[in-house]
């Protein structure tokens, strides 16, 4: 396979050791394939605030304000501060989850398709992260539905994909994402508190 570098006068023979065949498939010219799949990559010390909103369960929504790794305030969807003991291990693990969140691939939806699948009743959560410099990134997570196409789960047809979701990044880019990735982020306000200590008999 011949390849020519930018500003080069002559092409070069390109070889991958152990590979026999055309290299075209290894060097795709579609820019979306080469695009960084990063959505969130924040060390906890660079996070100023995280807001997670659940349209169908506002009581489970929450806002985290991060002063530093040892000082994080937690409020519910009504702005009420957390009551009870904070589960520090869970909180620390949750903040660490934002260090590496990626989508699977970019998808192009026709306007008619977009209007029928990215609908309010399919919206699972909206997550907004603000860094220490005030820059904001927001995503919307939708149940993955495709115009009546049936998904199969353990031999049974279901309306929504059980493995993947649609992710809308900054209200522009639409991507496929995996539940196993985003389940780390879509936790409940109540998960940040330790269960009450039961008195000993």
Feature locations, PLM:
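Soluble, acidic/polar mature domains that operate outside membranes
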Residues: 1-201
């Amino acid at each position: 396979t011949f390849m020519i570098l930018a500003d080069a006068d002559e092409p070069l023979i390109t070889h991958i050791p152990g590979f026999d065949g055309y290299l075209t498939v290894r060097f795709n010219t579609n820019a979306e394939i080469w695009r960084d799949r990063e959505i969130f990559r924040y060390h906890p010390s660079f996070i100023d605030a995280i807001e997670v909103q659940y349209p169908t369960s506002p009581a489970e929504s929450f806002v985290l304000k991060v002063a530093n790794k040892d000082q994080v305030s937690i409020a519910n969807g009504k702005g009420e501060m957390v009551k009870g003991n904070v589960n520090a291990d869970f909180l620390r693990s949750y903040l660490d989850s934002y260090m590496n969140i990626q989508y699977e691939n970019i998808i192009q939806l026709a306007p008619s398709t977009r209007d029928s699948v990215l609908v309010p009743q399919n919206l699972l959560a909206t997550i907004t992260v603000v860094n220490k410099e005030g820059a904001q990134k927001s995503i919307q997570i939708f149940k993955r539905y495709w115009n009546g196409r049936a998904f199969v789960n353990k031999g049974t047809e279901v309306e929504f994909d059980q493995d993947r979701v649609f992710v809308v990044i900054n209200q522009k880019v639409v991507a496929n994402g995996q539940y196993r990735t985003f389940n780390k982020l879509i936790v409940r306000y109540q998960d940040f508190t330790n269960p009450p200590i039961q008195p000993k008999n």
